[in-house]
Design a protein with these regions (language model features):
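A ligand-binding cleft/hinge motif common to bilobed small-molecule-binding domains
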Residues: 103, 108-126, 175
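Short, catalytically relevant binding-site loops at active-site mouths
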Residues: 97-98, 115-119, 134-137
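Non-transmembrane alpha-helical segments in soluble domains
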Residues: 35-38, 65, 81, 99, ...
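Extracellular/periplasmic bilobal clamshell ligand-binding domains
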Residues: 188-228
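Extracytoplasmic ligand-binding site segments that recognize negatively charged/polar headgroups
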Residues: 1-106
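Ligand-binding "clamshell"
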Residues: 1-7, 119-131
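Mature extracytoplasmic/periplasmic domains
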Residues: 136-137, 141-201
Length: 228
């Protein structure tokens, strides 16, 4: 599915929106997906960055909208309103502060992405990495060749190198970046895609309507803050 279908770029890695959960702080709370975050016990303990200036936070926003009914679905936006009411105005200053605050025990759960979450898990930190049961969006990381590149044949060889079995296996086993090759090897903490409920992002829609999506989010967040 994540293949070069346009001729303009080639996907070679996959970025994944996940929830990172502090095990010690959530012993009595079941967290398997987005719906489980709407728990009053988590008020002020949900870490997220600002979707307006964080690509991972924006990916989380569009992921939850897809899962809750769609980008223009009012029920989906009601979910966003309810979730950010529990965030309680505590927006992390950066994407890295999201997973760090959960690892440090400051926050109970964070809206983050797979790479740093798996690094913490591999390092033995007492966290869980949750792939939302409602649906997890996989966004491709792409490589492209510049038009009229001086060394076009070498550029093509480099793309082939990125997609080779050896490099894809190394990505999956020696890093925490998910390879795009279907049969690539992965480390033990990288959950198989066959075990994940995969949701599909309408990338064309999101690109064309990013400003409108962010305006809707910012209006909701501002309204929440005005009432606190």
């Amino acid at each position: 599915e994540y293949q070069n279908k346009t001729g303009f770029y080639t996907p070679y890695t996959l970025d994944v929106s996940v929830l990172i959960v502090n095990s010690a702080l959530t012993k009595d709370i079941k967290i398997e997906g987005y719906d489980d975050l709407l728990n009053s016990k988590l008020k002020g303990k949900i870490a997220t960055a600002d979707p307006s200036n964080s690509s991972s936070a924006f990916a989380q926003l569009t992921n939850m909208l897809v899962d809750q009914g769609g980008y223009e679905n009012e029920q989906a936006w009601t979910y966003v309103k309810n979730l950010f009411s529990l965030v309680d105005g505590k927006i992390a200053s950066s994407s890295s502060n999201v997973y760090k605050s959960v690892a440090d025990g400051e926050m109970a759960v964070g809206l983050t992405y797979e790479d740093p979450a798996l690094k913490l898990l591999n390092d033995g930190v007492d966290v869980k990495v949750i792939y939302p049961k409602e649906g997890t969006v996989f966004l491709p990381g792409n490589a492209a060749i510049i038009k009229n590149a001086k060394h076009i044949e070498n550029a093509k060889k480099f793309i082939d190198f990125l997609l080779s079995q050896d490099i894809q296996d190394k990505l999956g086993t020696e890093t925490t970046i998910r390879p795009n090759r279907k049969n690539a090897k992965t480390n033990k903490n990288m959950k198989s895609m066959t075990e994940i409920n995969i949701a599909t992002e309408d990338s064309g829609y999101v690109i064309q309507n990013k400003s409108a999506i962010l305006k809707k989010y910012n209006d909701i967040f501002t309204n929440i803050q005005s009432k606190q």
